[in-house]
């Protein structure tokens, strides 16, 4: 754009702003200064280089562009190269944060040739030397879309290690900065758990396909935030009106999926690439002279409604919190509920005969308090359901704190679909102690089971919502489950009625884990008891050893993985050109999986008896070696699983850094023992009688049946059976 060319309306100088707080990734979203930060972004560049090699317009043009962006509701800008310091200062002055591309994909050739060295690392870091520590930096994107052909040539593991190495370099240079990598559907199989948040470029022009793929990406990213680094549509081939319409629903769909942010590609049609100005693409919200297209107003309206428009017909929701002696965490739960942003809801607290200060704490808040005698969790939940005035009943635990937009995401799922119930993720809070962080990284925590990216087989009780009429149709919760198992039983009964369950990643709650090893043991013993109760009611869902055969996949942190010699498979299509390339995990073998089962320890105990006998009787001395191997196997697997853990938050001190991984390994080894104790104590044994007929001797028996008239043989057998 020539100097002095029209660049849109003249805007007043920006008002003085308070200094930026650095962004943090917590759970499924980004936060800054204690407030949630939805990234409402637009991409910028690349432009024809100036004499200094910077691929940006002059400061006057950049300032006008940034002023227009801020005026239209944007709060973030994505650049593809490291900007000069003056551009960062201008961004901060206009309230814009920058996602800065460091161009790591441009040097991938050195990795292919095996020539990547310390000199290349210094050059990579020095390119952004003016950016480190600047308050306007949202995050550094260390690379953008390493080509699928290169990833296939090098191998996914090698690329993952290279990306992790680049992330480590940036973190050492700027310890407080967020770091990410921008991927795309063709390399979605890259496993990058070390990123602070995940970015994808996604261009899908049908709403249903975008909704489905966003749900998939949310499951791939797990407990980390998801940001779409590029969405957009070319107005040359599709027209400006269709571009505006498409971008509006792309933005709304992205944020409705629970994404933490989105960048619209691009701010302007002006684009320089490969040494030439590009004229046959026009993805910009403004034209080359910065005159606005219809898409600019459409995107502005959509961005200002993030995550949802408050107006509209939002269903009434009754939030039910049941508590028995939960005063330690109840206040945090109710504080979170008081910060809920939703136009039509109520909070009901059911005090299930507590002996502590639950009722006193609840009385301090604007909630409906119901006191009952101690009848157990299921009964308390039924009491809350009966008192609810909403058409949707949402349950959370007294040790959980919902996200401010929790109810919006749940309600949107009910409005869009026919699910009878909807759940969401439960994530350990960043302020939980280090032992609680280790517990969260260990097995046995509340986890959701998904049949597909949006359909659930099970949703945990700390974060679940149901249509009230669906709960009433099955008479609510089964009161035999006093502390655990009620949510599993309810989900199975709904499934029996053909009532589906859904899952939404944005409907997040912070869920405190047990803060002591002793309480973790007690919790797992209780879960073992609940398994015994469930097996007694649902024997057809359990195998001979007393374990559930889930039809879906279990999601959540702390899952134990068995050893396997099989490698994951990547579907890459003919010539490696499939646009969506997926990773398929190998099936774990029976022997490897059995090491994870509580009953493995029964085998270890039996071998211990034989090994002890072998000390005194030579023919049984082989049992000593078998016992040593059997006892060492779960310990070695626990150490392996603990080594794989990626703690979401850094250690606070040296003691924590040294102890949390050994403690996690100990909890992985201990958890099956606790479950075994609870299962055996309440009759869930491998030798239990599953038929209900007792022990019957295997001898032939005869019986006489008198029939007044002839009957077919099959009918005579039925008469005998009855």
Residue ranges and their predicted role:
Residues 4, 265-313:
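Aromatic-rich peripheral "rim/lid" segments of glycoside hydrolase catalytic domains that contact
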Residues 405-436, 500, 512:
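Conserved donor NDP-sugar-binding/catalytic core segment of glycosyltransferases
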Residues 335-344:
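Short, acidic, metal-binding catalytic loop of nucleotide-sugar glycosyltransferases
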Residues 424-425, 439-457, 472:
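Short, flexible, basic/aromatic active-site loop/helix in glycosyltransferases
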Residues 29-195, 274:
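Active-site mouth of glycoside hydrolases
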Residues 393:
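Short aromatic/hydrophobic "clamp" motif used to bind/position activated sugar donors
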Residues 151-152, 157-257, 284-286:
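Extracellular glycoside hydrolase catalytic/binding regions
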Residues 336, 351-359, 400:
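A conserved acidic beta->alpha catalytic loop
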């Amino acid at each position: 754009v020539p100097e002095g060319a029209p660049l849109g309306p003249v805007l007043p100088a920006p008002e003085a702003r308070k200094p930026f707080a650095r962004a943090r990734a917590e759970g499924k979203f980004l936060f800054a200064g204690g407030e949630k930060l939805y990234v409402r972004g637009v991409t910028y560049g690349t432009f024809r280089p100036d004499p200094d090699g910077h691929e940006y317009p002059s400061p006057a043009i950049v300032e006008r562009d940034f002023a227009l962006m801020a005026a239209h509701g944007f709060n973030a800008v994505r650049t593809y190269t490291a900007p000069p310091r003056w551009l960062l200062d201008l961004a901060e002055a206009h309230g814009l944060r920058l996602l800065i591309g460091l161009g790591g994909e441009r040097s991938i050739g050195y990795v292919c040739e095996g020539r990547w060295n310390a000199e290349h690392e210094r050059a990579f870091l020095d390119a952004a030397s003016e950016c480190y520590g600047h308050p306007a930096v949202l995050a550094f994107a260390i690379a953008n879309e390493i080509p699928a052909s290169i990833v296939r040539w090098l191998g996914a593991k090698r690329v993952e290690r290279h990306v992790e190495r680049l992330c480590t370099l940036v973190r050492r240079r700027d310890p407080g900065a967020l770091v990410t990598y921008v991927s795309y559907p063709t390399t979605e199989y890259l496993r990058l758990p070390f990123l602070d948040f995940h970015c994808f470029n996604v261009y899908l022009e049908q709403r249903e396909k975008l909704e489905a793929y966003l749900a998939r990406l949310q499951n791939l990213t797990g407990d980390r935030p998801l940001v779409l680094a590029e969405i957009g549509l070319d107005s040359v081939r599709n027209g400006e009106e269709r571009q505006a319409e498409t971008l509006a629903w792309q933005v709304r769909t992205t944020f409705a999926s629970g994404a933490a942010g989105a960048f619209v590609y691009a701010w302007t049609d002006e684009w320089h690439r490969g040494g030439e100005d590009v004229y046959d693409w026009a993805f910009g919200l403004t034209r080359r002279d910065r005159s606005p297209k219809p898409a600019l107003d459409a995107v502005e309206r959509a961005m200002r409604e993030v995550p949802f428009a408050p107006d509209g017909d939002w269903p009434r929701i009754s939030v039910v919190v049941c508590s028995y002696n939960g005063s330690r965490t109840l206040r945090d739960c109710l504080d979170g509920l008081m910060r809920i942003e939703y136009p039509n809801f109520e909070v009901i607290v059911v005090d299930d005969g507590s002996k502590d200060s639950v009722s006193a704490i609840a009385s301090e808040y604007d909630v409906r308090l119901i006191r009952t005698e101690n009848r157990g969790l299921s009964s308390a939940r039924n009491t809350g359901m009966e008192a609810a005035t909403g058409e949707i009943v949402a349950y959370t635990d007294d040790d959980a704190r919902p996200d401010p937009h929790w109810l919006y995401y749940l309600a949107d799922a009910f409005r869009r679909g026919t699910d009878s119930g909807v759940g969401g993720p439960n994530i350990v809070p960043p302020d939980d102690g280090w032992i609680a962080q280790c517990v969260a990284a260990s097995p046995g925590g509340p986890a959701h089971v998904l049949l597909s990216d949006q359909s659930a087989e099970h949703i945990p009780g700390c974060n679940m919502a149901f249509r009230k009429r669906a709960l009433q149709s099955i008479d609510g919760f089964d009161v035999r489950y006093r502390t655990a198992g009620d949510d599993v039983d309810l989900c199975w009964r709904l499934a029996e009625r053909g009532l589906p369950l859904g899952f939404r990643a944005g409907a997040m709650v912070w869920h405190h884990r047990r803060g002591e090893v002793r309480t973790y043991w007690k919790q797992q013993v209780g879960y073992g008891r609940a398994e015994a109760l469930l097996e007694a009611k649902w024997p057809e869902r359990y195998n001979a050893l007393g374990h559930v055969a889930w039809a879906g996949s279990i999601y959540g942190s702390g899952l134990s993985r068995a050893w396997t010699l099989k490698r994951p498979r990547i579907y890459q299509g003919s010539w490696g050109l499939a646009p969506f390339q997926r990773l398929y995990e190998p099936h774990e073998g029976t022997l490897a999986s059995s090491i994870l089962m509580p009953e493995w320890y029964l085998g270890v105990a039996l071998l211990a008896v034989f090994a002890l006998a072998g000390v005194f009787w030579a023919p049984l001395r082989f049992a000593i070696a078998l016992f040593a191997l059997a006892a060492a196997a779960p310990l070695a697997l626990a150490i392996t699983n603990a080594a794989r853990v990626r703690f979401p938050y850094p250690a606070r001190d040296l003691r924590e850094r040294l102890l949390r991984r050994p403690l996690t390994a100990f909890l992985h080894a201990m958890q099956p023992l606790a479950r075994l104790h609870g299962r055996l104590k309440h009759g869930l044994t491998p030798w239990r009688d599953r038929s209900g007929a007792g022990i019957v001797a295997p001898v032939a028996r005869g019986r006489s049946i008198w029939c007044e008239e002839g009957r077919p043989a099959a009918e005579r057998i039925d008469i005998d059976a009855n």
